[in-house]
From Swiss-Prot:
Lineage: Bacteria, Bacillati, Bacillota, Bacilli, Bacillales
Entry keyword set: Allosteric enzyme, ATP-binding, Kinase, Nucleotide-binding, Transferase
Protein's name according to its UniProt entry: Protein-arginine kinase
Cellular component, GO annotation: extracellular space
Family: Belongs to the ATP:guanido phosphotransferase family.
Entry EC no(s): 2.7.14.1
GO molecular-function terms, A-Z: ATP binding; creatine kinase activity; protein kinase activity
NCBIfam families documented for this protein: PRK01059.1-4, PRK01059.1-5
Function according to Swiss-Prot or TrEMBL: Catalyzes the specific phosphorylation of arginine residues in a large number of proteins. Is part of the bacterial stress response system. Protein arginine phosphorylation has a physiologically important role and is involved in the regulation of many critical cellular processes, such as protein homeostasis, motility, competence, and stringent and stress responses, by regulating gene expression and protein activity.
Species in which this protein is naturally found: Halalkalibacterium halodurans (strain ATCC BAA-125 / DSM 18197 / FERM 7344 / JCM 9153 / C-125)
Length: 356
């Protein structure tokens, strides 16, 4: 398969679109946790009960559509390990669903902007992904899907507590709003060390791109709400929006200061990173991610011409182990992955040169 075709098939269609403030906010996500009234929660359910839940959801949801969105139901038990790994790398399912769920499944829309996980920590996890800074738009879509589902199945709901969930932090609205942000200038100027504790004090959580416990590789940070009880969905999203808008302003100001005070050093860093990506024969995931961050910053600041801004979004995913093995068509050792990663990045940058 040609690299162009592999990329076009591998990258989710929603990721190829532009969104507001996409130089800093790569994506916005709304996730709703829901459970069904007549079934035991996944943590307590037997294997047979988990099977019955999937059949129940399939009967009521998978064979119908929400507006123009048709869904495909994929069962974890039917998938090879690497296919599940790829879905995790695309942020379409959680590691928990891929590795630990009893008869887990996922319903995916055609453009992969909507995924509904089944038998994860909760019976249903409704997720909507948008490019750029579009939290409000993602909330509107997620709420619409939630209403559509609620018209077909009975949710576990308490008048005082709201939606009942497996984890106490999700009780209430069951809503988790998050954004993925690229904050290289705040990291370079070390302002991030002062900002992150302040964000945590506001009741928000900062993680790396693969969720809880993951490192913020490539200067990419996932910022989300923590508690869902006692606030409306709109208030939760508005609180997060306010913090994200401040971070956007601070990152832009830090980028401007770096350009004014250290332009030559910044150019050198960007071009060195581009040179390593364009010519290296072996590259580890961590180094590749950092160099891609430098290159993306150079593109956004106009220091590097003729390279697509989407290259960070694309290669952050395509150079993960699951995708590398999918492209190779075989299981790879760590050393083989480092070699393949370097080759794929070189080939992707060559495509940029050929298109200019």
């Amino acid at each position: 398969m040609s690299l162009q075709r592999f990329i076009s098939e591998a990258i989710s269609p929603w990721m190829k679109k532009d969104g507001p403030d996409s130089d800093i906010v790569l994506s916005s996500r709304i996730r709703l946790a829901r459970n069904l009234q007549s079934f035991r929660f996944p943590l307590l359910a037997t294997i047979e009960e988990s099977k019955q839940l999937v059949e129940h959801v399939k009967h009521h949801l998978a064979e119908s559509s929400y507006h123009t969105n048709r869904f495909e139901l994929l069962c974890m038990d039917d998938m090879k390990p690497n296919v599940k790994r790829v879905l995790v790398e695309k942020h379409l399912i959680s590691p928990h669903l891929a590795e630990e769920s009893k008869h887990g499944a996922v319903m995916l829309s055609e453009d992969e902007s909507i995924s509904i996980m089944i038998n994860e920590e909760d019976h249903l996890r409704i997720q909507c992904l948008f490019p750029g800074f579009q939290l409000s738009e993602a909330l509107v879509l997620a709420s619409g899907i939630d209403d559509w589902i609620e018209g077909k199945v009975d949710y576990a709901f308490d008048e005082k507590r709201g939606y009942l969930t497996s984890c106490p932090t999700n009780v209430g609205t069951g809503l988790r709003a998050s954004v993925m942000m690229h904050l290289p200038a705040l990291v370079m100027t070390q302002q991030i060390n002062r900002i992150l504790p302040a964000i945590n004090q506001l009741g928000l959580v900062v993680r790396g791109i693969y969720g809880e416990g993951s490192e913020a590789l490539g200067n990419l940070f996932q910022i989300s709400n923590q508690m869902t009880l006692g606030k409306s969905e709109e208030d939760i999203v508005e609180d997060l929006r306010g913090v994200v808008m401040q971070l956007i302003q601070q990152e832009r100001a830090a980028r401007k200061r770096l350009l004014e005070s250290s332009r030559l050093q910044l150019e050198d860093r960007v071009y060195r990173s581009y040179g390593i990506l364009a010519h290296s024969r072996i590259i580890e995931s961590k180094e590749a991610t950092q160099k891609l961050s430098d290159v993306r910053l150079g593109i956004d600041l106009g220091l590097l011409k003729g390279v697509s801004g989407n290259i960070l979004n694309e290669l952050m995913i395509l150079t993960q182990p699951g995708f590398l093995q999918q492209y190779a068509g075989t299981v790879l050792t760590a050393d083989q992955r480092d070699e393949r990663r370097a080759a794929l990045i070189r080939a992707r940058l060559k495509l940029e040169d050929e298109s200019n």
